[in-house]
């Protein structure tokens, strides 16, 4: 393990797992219309989940915050511009860090996701606004950063348990919401259900978020959960602290897990963590590959990756022993 992430004052392989949520897009802020409580209102279930992940050897938890805007966490005005975070969302961030302290784990909150780029819709009496118009317009994007990202970061920084904030994942798989750019033969293929923005607009969002997060929480690393190495060419100029690519069967067919980070297009000047891959005995079986979890993890360990977070606890909790086997074999190099 020639590289790693500093965890608990020592450089370690950042072994973790995607939570990624207990209630999709409602863990932070809750969703009263659907009778869903956030972390601070119903901490027992979240605490039990974190304890189970820790017991399985996971020390880093990737946890989604606002993958879309269905929750009561983000407040909006009549123009659908964000005006701030609810008291419950701020309390939920504080509680999440407290629970992380109790469980002995570190958090990497994922602030946004490509899911939020769906057009505005109303589902079961809940209006879910779209992030796309906010990203497209510089003035509205500034409100998004000032009124959502900034207070979230300030809440984390104000926590007495802020040391449990290991890093940030600014946005999950933004490539699915980027329009064809004409800049590379490996161009974007946006999800047809989403309202795509330009590459420049997406990079502006990421850059503006980075500025706030590094100011408010300077000890926490910044990353983006990249959908695939196919699009690594587009983001090498972003000054993120950690590369965080994702890999599933379709990616592995063309950009195999056996390659070192630099061979996949990720800058060697910063650590690379595999941020998503299936938590199952053969993670790439969706493309008929029979490589085992243990073999894949050992390859990343050997080839200089700084960590790995399989997907995900909510659906694959029965497979947590796969993580524990690896954690036990590596000892303190993989778990504080």
Q: What is the meaning of each model-derived region?
A:
Residues 46, 206, 257-258, 293:
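Amphipathic coiled-coil/heptad-repeat helices and related helical stalk/stem segments
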Residues 301-334:
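Aromatic/acidic polysaccharide-binding cleft in carbohydrate-active enzymes
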Residues 135-142, 326-336:
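Short, basic, helix/turn surface patches
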């Amino acid at each position: 393990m020639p590289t790693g992430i500093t965890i608990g004052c020592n450089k370690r392989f950042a072994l973790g797992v995607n939570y990624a949520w207990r209630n999709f897009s409602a863990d932070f802020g809750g969703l009263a219309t659907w009778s869903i409580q956030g972390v601070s209102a119903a901490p027992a279930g979240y605490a039990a989940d974190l304890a189970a992940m820790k017991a399985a050897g996971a020390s880093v938890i990737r946890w989604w915050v606002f993958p879309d805007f269905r929750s009561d966490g983000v407040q909006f005005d009549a123009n659908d511009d964000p005006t701030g975070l609810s008291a419950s969302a701020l309390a939920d961030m504080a509680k999440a860090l407290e629970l992380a302290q109790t469980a002995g784990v570190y958090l990497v909150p994922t602030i946004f996701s490509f899911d939020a780029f769906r057009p505005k819709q109303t589902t079961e009496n809940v209006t879910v606004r779209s992030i796309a118009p906010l990203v497209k317009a510089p003035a509205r994007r500034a409100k998004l950063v000032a009124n959502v990202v900034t207070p979230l970061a300030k809440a984390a920084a104000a926590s007495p348990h802020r040391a449990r904030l290991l890093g940030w994942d600014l946005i999950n798989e933004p490539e699915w919401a980027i329009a064809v750019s004409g800049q590379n033969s490996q161009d974007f293929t946006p999800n047809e259900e989403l309202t795509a923005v330009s590459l420049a607009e997406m990079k502006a969002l990421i850059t503006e978020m980075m500025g706030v997060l590094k100011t408010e929480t300077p000890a926490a690393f910044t990353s983006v959960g990249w959908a695939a190495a196919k699009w690594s060419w587009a983001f090498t100029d972003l000054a993120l602290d950690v590369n965080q690519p994702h890999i599933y069967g379709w990616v592995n067919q063309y950009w195999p897990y056996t390659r070192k980070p630099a061979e996949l297009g990720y800058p060697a000047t910063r650590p690379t963590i595999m941020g998503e891959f299936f938590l199952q005995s053969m993670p790439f079986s969706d493309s008929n590959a029979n490589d085992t979890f243990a073999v894949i993890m050992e390859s990343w360990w050997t080839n200089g990756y700084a960590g790995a977070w399989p997907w995900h606890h909510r659906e694959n909790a029965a497979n947590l022993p796969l993580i524990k086997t690896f954690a036990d074999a590596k000892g303190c190099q993989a778990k504080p």
